[in-house]
């Protein structure tokens, strides 16, 4: 029984890490879009910081991918692609 509880705990940890990475990637994507539209230096700097944070979080969450559902893996891949398309070359 302890093994099942341990597995469940690991799965939950993996799931939360992947979900957090996806949310951060979505936030960074929105920040980059806003910065592109506004061309305000502060917005651009903020968006670049969000992008870097999201990329680091996605990289850290990759180790958890084998332990989450196929649906979560798809969402993760979409978030990763979204960020790769929105790299901070804003001008």
Where are the regions a protein language model picked out?
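Long, charged/polar, soluble alpha-helical segments
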Residues: 1-91
């Amino acid at each position: 029984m302890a093994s099942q509880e341990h597995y469940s705990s690991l799965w939950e940890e993996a799931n939360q890490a992947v979900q957090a990475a996806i949310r951060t990637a979505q936030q960074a994507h929105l920040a980059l879009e806003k910065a592109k539209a506004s061309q305000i230096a502060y917005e651009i700097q903020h968006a670049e910081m969000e992008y870097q944070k999201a990329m680091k979080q996605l990289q850290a969450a990759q180790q958890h991918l084998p332990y989450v559902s196929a649906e979560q893996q798809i969402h993760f891949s979409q978030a990763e692609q979204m960020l790769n398309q929105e790299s901070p070359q804003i001008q």
